[in-house]
Every structure is written in C-alpha cells, then in structure tokens.
Regions:
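Active-site groove signature of glycoside hydrolases
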Residues: 17, 31-68
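Active-site-adjacent "subsite" loops/lids of carbohydrate-active enzymes
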Residues: 1-42
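Non-membrane alpha-helical structural segments and their capping/turn regions in soluble enzymes
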Residues: 25-33, 72, 76-83
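Short acidic, gly/pro-rich beta-turn/loop elements at beta-sheet edges
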Residues: 3-4, 60, 108, 170
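Active-site-proximal substrate-binding groove within the catalytic cores of carbohydrate-active enzymes
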Residues: 54, 82-177
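Aromatic- and acidic-residue-enriched segments that line the glycan-binding/catalytic groove
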Residues: 1-15, 63-64, 112-122
C-alpha cells in the first residue's frame, strides 16, 4: 500500500484495500497541503493537475451508513477541506495554473472552476460525436476546457477541437498530415 495507507489509514475513507483520501480530516488536509506544497517548490512545478477518477459517493455513502443521523456530513467536510486545499495551494503559489480532471467531469462545478481549469474535461474522449456533444454542452458555461484527438482524419480532428487540445498521435507515422 501507499505511505498514507500504511501509516495513516485514519486519513482515508473506506475499509477495504481501496481507500479514499479524506480532505475533511483536518490533520490529513494539513499534511497533504504541506506535502504537495513542498513538492511544487522542490521540483519547481508551475502547473498542478488534480485528477479525480474515483467514485467518491461510494465512500461517503459508507460513512453515512456508519452515522445515520449525520447524512451527508462526510461529503460536506470533504468538499470544504478540498476547497481549502485548492485555495491554500493558490495562496502559496500565486499564478500557478491548476488543471482539474475527473471521470465523467465530476469536478466541473462552479466552486472548483473558480480555482482551476479542465485542460482534460473527461476520460470519455476521442469519439467524435460524443466529444462534439461535450463541447456543445459545456461551451456556454465553461468556455475553456480540453479534449484530445488520436486519429488523423479531418472529421476526427475537427470534432475534437477545443480551446485546449491534446494530440495523441504516433509521430512515427510518416504520411500523417
């Protein structure tokens, strides 16, 4: 397991082998903030990516079952802690770009968008019609987001065009235009 899993299981939610870091735990929040801050400084990092491809509701629902009189509190504490974490990173690193990503766009909500941009908006990517739908649906509300292209046809490329685009192409292909 990870260092956190082995040394501080109380900083996580869940009882199985897969656990979820709990930003709602003040001690865990302080440690994570200081740890990431020190890595950003020591490695001279100026763009931070916060990925969130986790079914967090499973962990929060499990906590709700343990505390039936406190439904939703685990999620509320986690979200408040997470937003404090993001705010503190921005305070310590003014001007640093923060990229948010989540399976299916779970981090594309207003409070998070005040703090970060989705350079990669969803792991549902590359499929032209689906990405067109994402771009159409998001553009009025979230003008800056990213997608990617992994095929070299004009249709695929244009379908995946967005303000931020990832080119996932094989540079060894000699006849690629």
């Amino acid at each position: 397991g990870s260092w956190i899993y082995e040394n501080h299981p109380e900083w996580t939610l869940g009882d199985g082998t897969t656990r979820f870091f709990n930003y709602g735990n003040p001690e865990a929040l302080a440690w994570m903030t200081d740890h990431v801050d020190s890595l950003l400084k020591s490695e001279d990092i100026d763009l931070y990516r916060q990925d969130f491809a986790v079914m967090s509701s499973d962990y929060w629902n499990e906590e709700d079952r343990k505390n039936p009189d406190r439904q939703g509190i685990a999620e509320i504490k986690h979200v408040i802690g997470y937003l404090k974490y993001m705010d503190e990173l921005q305070r310590r690193h003014p001007g640093m770009l923060i990229d948010i990503c989540a399976a299916g766009g779970k981090r594309l909500e207003l409070e998070n968008l005040r703090r970060a941009v989705p350079l990669w908006r969803s792991d549902y990517a590359f499929e032209p019609v689906g990405v067109q739908g994402q771009t159409y649906g998001l553009s009025a509300w979230i003008p800056f987001s990213g997608a990617g292209v992994n095929r070299i046809t004009a249709y695929d490329f244009r379908s995946n065009m967005s303000p931020s685009i990832v080119l996932n192409l094989d540079s060894r292909v000699k006849d690629a235009d």
